[in-house]
């Protein structure tokens, strides 16, 4: 078994909005015929009249562009992925729900959106056809891009789940009740209030709750647990 020392430059996830790329790419044209152009005035998109361009995102290497748009009179939005070198469409799909952000990794495009239930959904989509390969859901996700870690502190299920940010695969799940019992705190219900990064893949979790001890169920507690993630092959 070898320890995996992830290289920041290859696994970093970067989210770029249209504002970060407004110098190189822009939405322009007549009111009824908006298109996206690059800095050399090359037209990238070829939408029909009255197409609504809600947003677009450029990959860190400037080789791909994802456009979130809706054709005139259509009920649903579309996501279209372009190859900026060939100016051709790679893939297109109807994502079904809103697109609040897009993140780019080596192997996956991550569509991020807020669900109707209040949580955040990370959809890991293939660059080839935009199909969903993997999904991570969390009410209060903690994103450590530099460490390639995505954390789901799930108070309801009394657990903390760690994922690789770059591909959404699960690394480790911590049972909070067992972790607290190791500190001689026998908890009934818990609430994870805050997560802080305190080192390289090392995190501090601020937890409060009630005891699960006969006659002491009304007693409250506050504590902190620290967890360090060591990735192994």
Please describe what each predicted stretch is:
Residues 4-14:
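Sec-dependent N-terminal signal peptides
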Residues 16-20:
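Sec/Tat signal peptide C-region and signal peptidase I cleavage site
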Residues 21-61:
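N-terminal "mature head" segments of proteins
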Residues 23-25, 190-233:
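Hydrophilic extracytoplasmic domains
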Residues 26, 67-68, 111-112, 152, ...:
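Residue position within the beta-strands of beta-propeller blades
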Residues 32-47, 77-92, 119-136, 160-182, ...:
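Surface-exposed loop/turn elements that mediate protein-protein interactions on large endomembrane-trafficking
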Residues 56-64, 101-109, 142-149, 189, ...:
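Blade-terminus and WD-like Trp-Asp/Gly-His loop motifs, strongest in beta-propeller folds
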Residues 71-75, 115-119, 156-158, 210-214:
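Short glycine/acidic-enriched loop and turn motifs that connect beta-strands
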């Amino acid at each position: 078994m070898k320890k995996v020392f992830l290289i920041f430059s290859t696994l970093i996830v970067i989210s770029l909005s249209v504002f970060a790329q407004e110098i190189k790419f822009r939405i322009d044209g007549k009111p009824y015929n908006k298109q996206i152009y690059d800095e050399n005035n090359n037209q990238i998109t070829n939408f029909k009249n009255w197409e609504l361009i809600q947003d677009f995102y450029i990959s860190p290497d400037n080789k791909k562009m994802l456009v979130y748009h809706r054709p005139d009179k259509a009920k649903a939005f579309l996501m279209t992925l372009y190859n900026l070198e060939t100016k051709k469409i790679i893939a297109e799909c109807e994502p079904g729900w809103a697109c609040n952000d897009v993140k780019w990794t080596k192997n996956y495009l991550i569509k991020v959106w807020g669900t109707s239930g209040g949580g955040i959904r990370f959809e890991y989509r293939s660059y080839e056809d935009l199909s969903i390969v993997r999904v991570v859901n969390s009410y209060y996700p903690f994103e450590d891009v530099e460490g390639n870690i995505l954390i789901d502190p799930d108070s309801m299920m009394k657990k903390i789940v760690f994922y690789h940010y770059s591909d959404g695969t699960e690394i480790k799940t911590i049972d909070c009740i067992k972790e607290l019992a190791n500190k001689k705190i026998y908890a009934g219900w818990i609430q994870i209030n805050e997560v802080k990064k305190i080192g390289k893949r090392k995190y501090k979790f601020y937890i409060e709750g009630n005891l699960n001890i006969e006659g002491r169920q009304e007693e409250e507690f506050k504590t902190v647990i620290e967890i360090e993630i060591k990735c192994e092959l």
